């Protein structure tokens, strides 16, 4: 996986060999649920183990992603842009309008929390109907576990699972 980071520099997933990685394919940069997740991961980052990295992939241009992530301040993990959707296809990330609708039905309290934090997607740049997906990679870059969204667009690993993986 080779993409641009929010500062415009190149990122290569292979540079993280030797570390465990939580790789998450998000939706578009202004997605309210995604921004809530970024905020949560930033606030809980000190609970993760050593030798562990988080990489978040957004279907967005670098410019838009940088603008949207600015509200979070400095982030202790890697955020990259895949404006062409190429790695989403390679990793078989699904697009589903049904799962998007289910997200608002099943995750209404989460949506309200995002709105209260000001994560309102005024400008949508990217596919609206991406069903997120989570990957745990071992120190050699081998996929250990995958969680594709099943019932809604944000059906990924729970925080407790991510934390446990980071501490193993």
PLM features per residue range, with description:
Residues 37-90, 96:
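Structural microenvironment flanking redox-active thiols in thiol-disulfide oxidoreductases
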Residues 152-167:
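A short, polar/charged loop-to-alpha-helix boundary motif
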Residues 10, 17-19, 51, 131:
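A structure-centric signal for secondary-structure junctions around beta-strands
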Residues 1-14:
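N-terminal "domain-start" segment that seeds a small globular fold
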Residues 14-42:
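Short active-site neighborhood of thiol/selenol oxidoreductases, capturing the structured segment around
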Residues 82-153:
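Thiol/selenol-based redox catalytic cores and closely related redox-interacting motifs
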């Amino acid at each position: 996986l080779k993409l641009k980071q929010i500062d415009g520099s190149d990122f290569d997933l292979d540079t993280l060999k030797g570390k465990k990685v939580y790789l998450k394919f998000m939706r578009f940069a202004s997605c309210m649920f995604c921004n809530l997740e970024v905020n949560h991961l930033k606030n809980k980052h000190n609970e993760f183990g050593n030798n562990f990295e988080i990489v978040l992939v957004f279907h967005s241009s670098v410019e838009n992603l940088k603008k949207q992530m600015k509200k979070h301040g400095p982030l202790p993990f890697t955020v990259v842009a895949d404006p062409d959707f190429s790695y989403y296809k390679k990793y078989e990330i699904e697009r589903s309008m049904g799962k998007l609708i289910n997200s608002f039905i099943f995750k209404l309290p989460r949506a309200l929390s995002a709105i209260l934090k000001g994560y309102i997607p005024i400008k949508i740049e990217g596919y609206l109907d991406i069903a997120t997906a989570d990957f745990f990679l071992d120190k050699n870059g081998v996929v250990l576990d995958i969680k594709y969204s099943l019932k809604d667009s944000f059906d990924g690993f729970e925080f407790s699972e991510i934390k446990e993986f980071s501490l193993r």
